Amino acid sequence: MVAVVERKYRASRRLGVNLWGRSKDPVATRNYPSGQHGSMGYKKLSSFGRQFAAHQKFKCYYAMSSKQLTNTFLRAYNRKGDTGDNLVGALESRLAVVVYSAGFVPTVFSARQLVSHKHVTVNGKVVNIPSFSVKPGDVVQIRERATELPMVLAAIQSQERRVPDHLEVDTAQRSARYLRVPKYCEVPYPANMEVNLVVEFFSG
């Protein structure tokens, strides 16, 4: 898990943004790329470079592989409505993301771990698939045996993140009701995520 967190911070540094809005992210104090020539700063990106960087930000923020993000985009593209909103709605509906957004864990990586270890239920039933799609009205809850885990307690006590409006969180019960599928403009991203550039990247 430590290795995953270190890779996460390297991603923030490489992209030049504090992706998760955490105070301990090194990009907050060293806003330049890592490596021998990192202090020279970030290069000006081409149009494609900006699209690729936006794609990388989404992939890192949601802890997904390129294949997973591509497949999610294709489903969003084939649905009616705005493709960017469809994409963000699908990403925010992932079970691990709901657990993270509700503030029950400090990172989306630990949310994936919590789900995989069968510590999370949806409507009272254990679900151990991080990519499981939560539907409006579903109740996601941390199982009692996991409510005292240090990472859960630390995340709940932290004030670093704001719970989005599409979730109704009961901190005492360690539960969150998924009220609706959010649009891009409704998600309180700590960084500028530029979903329009992601759509352009996949559409090019």
Curated annotation (Swiss-Prot):
The keyword rRNA-binding applies. One of the primary rRNA binding proteins, it binds directly to 16S rRNA where it nucleates assembly of the body of the 30S subunit. Part of the 30S ribosomal subunit. Contacts protein S5. The interaction surface between S4 and S5 is involved in control of translational fidelity. InterPro entries: Ribosomal_uS4, Ribosomal_uS4_bac-type, Ribosomal_uS4_CS, Ribosomal_uS4_N, S4_RNA-bd, S4_RNA-bd_sf. One of its GO terms (molecular function) is rRNA binding. CDD domains: S4. Keywords: Ribonucleoprotein, Ribosomal protein, RNA-binding, rRNA-binding. Residues 93-156 form the S4 RNA-binding domain. It comes from the Bacteria. GO terms for biological process: ribosomal small subunit biogenesis; translation. This is Small ribosomal subunit protein uS4. Pfam families: Ribosomal_S4, S4. GO terms for cellular component: small ribosomal subunit. The keyword Repeat does not apply. Belongs to the universal ribosomal protein uS4 family. Transmembrane segments: none annotated.
